[in-house]
Amino acid sequence: MTGFWVLCFVLFPSSLSYPESWMPLVNLTHHILRDTNSSLFSNCWVCLSTQTQRSLAVPAPLSIWTDTPMKLHLTYSVRPFSGSFSISDIERRLRLFRPLTASYSFHNPDRRAIAFLQLVSSTGIFRIITRITSVIYPHKDRFFESAQRPLWGPLFTETVLRSQAPLCISRFFKVSAYATFVGNLSASLCNYTMHISPSTSHENLDLSTTHTFKQAMKRPDAKWKNPLRFSGPPSLIFSKPAYYPCPTDIKHCHTSPATPWMHCPQAPFGTCYNLTLFEPDNSTHPVTMSVNPTHFKVKLQGHRDPYPLSHYQPLTGAALSGQYSVWENEITVQENWDITSNIFSHLLSFSYAFCLNSSGVFFLCGTSTYICLPANWSGVCTLVFQYPDIELLPNNQTVPVPLFASVLSSDSVLRPKRSPHLFPFLAGLGISSALGTGIAGLATSTLYFQQLSKVLSETLEEIAASITTLQNQIDSLAGVVLQNRRALDLITAEKGGTCLFLQEECCFYVNQSGIVRDAARKLQERASELGQHSDSWGQWPDLGRWLPWLTPFLGPLLFLFFLLTFGSCLLNCLTRFVSQRLGSFVQDTAKRHVDSILQNFQYKKLPQDSPDEDTIPT
């Protein structure tokens, strides 16, 4: 009988209008299974979030701010052309292409963009540009390349920060229309906030005074004879400006005539200041961080200084993200012959966007997490580690699924709203997952995982077949090469063979087809195992998107089926049970009534023999 009620609790959803209505039934089912010592009872709850945009985050330690690299995504746009052009190979364009000569024309947008990059960095107008175009990796003689296919937009939009972050960065524009708002963290979640101020000033340059453009300016058809104007660099705003001299980076700076854009600092010392911060898990021992406001570089005192030019730090990428423009001064003559020399026309714009290049680290801005910050981002952000909303609970604790949650409405008033955010799985509760009724998510999840396993198995088989085909092509090509080699040896036999004739080292092909075929065979075996494992699962009908809508109705239908099938038996048993109980009750009542009458009233015993009629008393 207990099993029947357990089945009813699992199958029958009490209300189809509210998706959280089955949560109390799950708790009740769990308690019944525990009290009856059922084999379906589990000692653990596994609670997952049903909202794909929801996650939890913990603040990253201060060492992440110094050691986490970032990648640059650089695009530019020019006046004569519409759209943006991506510079995807800065190394090749800057090392091999040198437009700063008199023989080059600058109608090509790529040439103009690279020329401006060289011009800005070589003249020192924008000192930070050196770090953007000449970063060298350690132990590698190559330059930094811009990030390919960055992931724009937020990854999660409902991220909750569990504790206070040691460091935050803030940036706001005076004109909000020019900015892309990413989110705003409250002041209580930030131990210290660095304020980045976008540049509102510009710097002018007369090309005739630059050494690199002197030869180009002598040509009659030379371009850019008019003065240029550049966007200025951003700056840091400090609440406690306590500066001290700090050494500049000249050890890893390389300057050569072939790379004039790699401008090295002239002064051996710059200006820095210290911050006293606290780690997220240690609020008793402060940590001192040194900040270089010129290059937007941070360093923890007592820690080894990271390679200065190996990567951009998060503060560097956040500060330099933006759009920087170049204008040309056009001197015009008005009708009254007055000369107007203060009109600048837009020539070219650079857009710098940076992406985190370390797995597991994200920018948290408000409640949204990002890998790449937009060029003109605006808001308050910090670095975090994030993880999904998963909880493990013991068997003696009720699933914490609130039927009501307080959410912020449009009129900024907290009001209760039905919002279940946890999805409990009963580990070992085979009835719910096997039948897939009442709880549509379990059946849908099983179907999706089955389809995913099938697709993965087919993909592995295709990869194995492709590898085998490529190996067969290589084997046939090797056979052709060996035939040609033998023919060449016969032709050049009089001169000692092909190698002696070419005066080169003899090279031979080492056939490793056995290793490749073994790898392909292992892939096929894994695909076969996945296929068998997928076939062993319950074969659900391929209803696609209709399955989540159909499964909630299966519970009531099955309940009605069981009721119609066993209803007559149950009614017969119930009638017989009531009749028996009624008969026993009537008999007991009548017996008690008779006994009571006999005890309360006295009756005389009738004589056994009747008196003699002819006997007359005297």
Swiss-Prot record:
InterPro entries for this protein: TLV/ENV_coat_polyprotein
GO cellular component: plasma membrane
Xref: SUPFAM superfamilies: Virus ectodomain
Site positions (Cleavage): 418-419
Induction info: In males, up-regulated in regenerating muscle tissue after injury.
UniProt keyword Repressor, yes or no: no
Residue span of motif CX6CC: 499-507
PTM comment: Synthesized as an inactive precursor that is heavily N-glycosylated and processed likely by furin in the Golgi to yield the mature SU and TM proteins. The cleavage site between SU and TM requires the minimal sequence [KR]-X-[KR]-R. The CXXC motif is highly conserved across a broad range of retroviral envelope proteins. It is thought to participate in the formation of a labile disulfide bond possibly with the CX6CC motif present in the transmembrane protein. Isomerization of the intersubunit disulfide bond to an SU intrachain disulfide bond is thought to occur upon receptor recognition in order to allow membrane fusion.
Extracellular side: 18-545
Sites carrying sugar chains: 27, 184, 274, 357
Residue segments, region Immunosuppression: 482-498
Keywords: Cell membrane, Developmental protein, Disulfide bond, ERV, Glycoprotein, Membrane, Signal, Transmembrane, Transmembrane helix
Result, substituting residue 495 to R: Loss of immunosuppressive activity. No effect on fusogenic activity
One biological process term in Gene Ontology: myoblast fusion involved in skeletal muscle regeneration
Region annotation (Fusion peptide) ranges: 422-442
UniProt motif (CXXC) ranges: 44-47
S-S pairs: 44-47, 44-507, 499-506
Consequence of gene loss (knockout): Viable, although growth is retarded and neonate numbers are reduced. In the placental labyrinth, formation of syncytiotrophoblast layer II (SynT-II) is abnormal with reduced cell fusion and progressive expansion of maternal blood lacunae. Unfused SynT-II cells form dense plaque-like structures between adjacent cells, which resemble cell junctions and are associated with high expression levels of GJB6/connexin-30. Formation of syncytiotrophoblast layer I (SynT-I) is grossly normal.
PANTHER family in the record: SYNCYTIN-B (PTHR10424:SF83), VIRAL ENVELOPE PROTEIN (PTHR10424)
Misc remark: The mouse genome contains a high percentage of proviral-like elements, also called endogenous retroviruses (ERVs) that are the genomic traces of ancient infections of the germline by exogenous retroviruses. Although most of these elements are defective, some have conserved a functional envelope (env) gene, most probably diverted by the host for its benefit.
Protein task: This endogenous retroviral envelope protein has retained its original fusogenic properties. Together with Syna, participates in trophoblast fusion and the formation of a syncytium during placenta morphogenesis. Synb is specifically involved in formation of syncytiotrophoblast layer II (SynT-II). Promotes myoblast fusion, and may play a role in regeneration of damaged muscle tissue in males. May have immunosuppressive activity.
Designated name of the protein: Syncytin-B
The species this protein was found in: Mus musculus
